[in-house]
Amino acid sequence: MELQLQDKTLGQWLEHWAETTPDKEYLVYSDRDLRFTWKEFNERVDRMAKGMLSIGIEHGTHVGIWATNVPDWLTFLYAAAKIGAVAVTVNTNYKQNELEFLVENADIHTMCITEGVFDGSYIDMMYTMLPELKESQRGYLKSKRFPRLKNVVYIGQEKYRGMYNTPELLLLGENIEDDKLEAAKKLVDCHDVVNMQYTSGTTGFPKGVMLTHHNIANNGLLTGEHMKFTADDKLCCCVPLFHCFGVVLASMNVLTHGCTQVMVEKFDPLVVLASIHKERCTALYGVPTMFIAELNHPMFPMFDLTSLRTGIMAGSLCPVELMRQVEEKMFMRVTSVYGLTETSPGMTHSRIDDPAEERYNTVGRDFEFTEVRVIDPETGEECPVGVQGEMCNRGYNNMKGYYNNPAATAEVIDKDGFLHSGDLGVKDENGFYRITGRIKDMIIRGGENVYPREIEEYLYHLEGVKDVQVAAVPSKKYGEEVGAFIILHEGVTMTDDVVKDFCRGKIARHKIPKYIFF
């Protein structure tokens, strides 16, 4: 069958598999033996979609999801998608300042949260942000600072003052007639925005990247085709769902191929290895640090990983020797994807049948139905083969734009429709690309984009700081670490710990400078 772009919404994809392969396993949490078939999962999504309708969520409503890869993360995503709402995925490392910025900037109507991560309680941060919440009846939140925010939903069984929990939302949904749900589904178009992810992008403070059903479903479809995915595959996903790596490259790959997603809630190399062994996973995705942790785990030799055949290593610089070790010891042909959140995210991808040296040393070739050009940043002309320039993309995968920010959108998408990445690259005579650097000064730490200016402006508020510059420091583990170069006012002394303590709990931990120079 000829490969072509599909016009299905996420809900239509889900219902397709629920109808054609109802009893096939779709979602598995091996460490707790939790399993959903396509039919079971689709039914739960419909119930959740009714629950969302019951609390005022409708076409175009923005629903925040702030959680690790818990079992209902995908339920909330697809429930929102089915009724035309927009899932705004929130970085699990966010702290108070970042949360408040996102809730306001994204016009969040309903926030869905879990307890939090080890160094931050989402519950506490919500109550700090919304002092009215503890005195509010569920569904009647009236926040002075965030008037658009109407509901907070706890993803789980526990009850918190002013918040719905999952069972309550499902129960409320029972009051919604099937006809109302079906009517909501019919309003959804594949070119509607379904997901917003906040990224520093190529410049500035975090912006909401608007991605459509068409953007992300087709990126997942083509990524899977490059690795010859079929319904028989089982993909182990240990990357966070709030990133494009998890929610698109992994989840949309599974959605468009009808295979099985073996999920890991929070990265733990032992859980990953055990899941592959027990479920006979055929594919594994991860950033380089994850593969290093798996290979170096003392119990690594105890697991049978021979079922693996392929996967993706991406998110930051992928060392050639690490890719060789993964192929040799984990029995999988590693591919790499290059792109941005703004390109849904894949712009280039190596294919499973590409020669090993091409898979190790390049980021592959461009996606079908797109144009990737290496453009001279000075002249705007396309660079010849072998000449470095800016990586630019035009095609189905380009974002719809930055939310409520047409000026920033116009800065990255030119009049010809090419999205400018800010990254430098080179194309060879066989059509393979190599990334050679960045025009801007973005730091990529273990797959996380860190924008120096954001940290610099925060550190300027630290008493005693006269000037500060933030830059990347090379790291074997994370590719890059954050380094802060600080000039103090005359007579002021300061230690590294003072700077780090000033940052803790206020900015995400991956943004806190590891190296500080006075």
Question: Where do the language-model regions lie?
Answer:
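Structural core segment of the AMP-binding/adenylate-forming
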Residues: I83-L171, E490
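Conserved pre-ATP/AMP-binding loop-to-beta segment of ANL
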Residues: P22-E25, R145-L149, V153-Y160, Y164-Y198, ...
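AMP-dependent adenylate-forming
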Residues: W13-T37, K159-Y160
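Conserved AMP-binding/adenylation subdomain of ANL enzymes
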Residues: A217-K234, F242-A283, F291-A293, H297-P298
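Conserved AMP-binding A3 loop
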Residues: R35-K39, K185-L187, H191-N218
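AMP-binding/adenylate-forming catalytic core of the ANL superfamily
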Residues: Y94-E104, I113-E115, L284, G395, ...
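Gly/Ser/Thr-rich phosphate-binding loop
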Residues: L171, L273, K278-G286, L295-E358, ...
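Conserved AMP-binding/adenylate-forming core of the ANL superfamily
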Residues: Y26-V70, L74-Y78, K95-E100, N165-E174, ...
